[in-house]
């Protein structure tokens, strides 16, 4: 298989401008399918903006972003048609009046018991089940959102601020399940964090951002596969 055939994303001269301020400016970045990527950088470095572009939630000001060798399809009004196989954690609407357990049983009726045993057995996480979504703390909501993503079997899973609000048990389970998903299903996983240690443990490729530019790409646990250039 040639190198281009393994690409799932390709970015060229990608720029995003908000109110005359350039937030990201990426000369070139290639993301390969079936790989776990970590996007690292300080607050304000452009991580969230980059992830939202990869998810099809925002349009670039300039440049090219290809998913599966094609730019995203658009409606006649110019809005991006987000592919259903791309899952951006936290972007899927569910009724805030329902409890966590009710949502799980509603969305995944055939495997709700397994989900509860797998993700809500810890001393902290098990307290989440009877709570309504509108009463969840930011950390509890982040865990619930990730659980929905892990069980949705997406082709691409994207999460901003990975593990920022998790305790040690939650972070361990999250890493374990993301690695399982990647290994068993071939899911491309793209995570961001300000914490180098959180992603270095299990990402195959680490992409470092600063002031909207890629400053370096380094291999994590496996051989480096991402290619980039600054501009």
Go through the PLM ranges and name each one.
Residues 2-27, 76:
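A short, flexible loop at the N-terminus of ABC-type nucleotide-binding domains that lies
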Residues 40-42:
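The feature captures the beta-strand-to-loop junction immediately N-terminal to the Walker
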Residues 55:
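Helix-to-loop junction immediately C-terminal to a conserved catalytic motif
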Residues 63-74, 80-82:
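Conserved ABC transporter NBD signature motif
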Residues 92, 97-111:
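Q-loop/switch helix immediately C-terminal to the Walker
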Residues 157-161:
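Catalytic Walker B motif of ABC-type/P-loop ATPase nucleotide-binding domains
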Residues 192-194:
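H-loop/switch region of ABC-family ATPase nucleotide-binding domains
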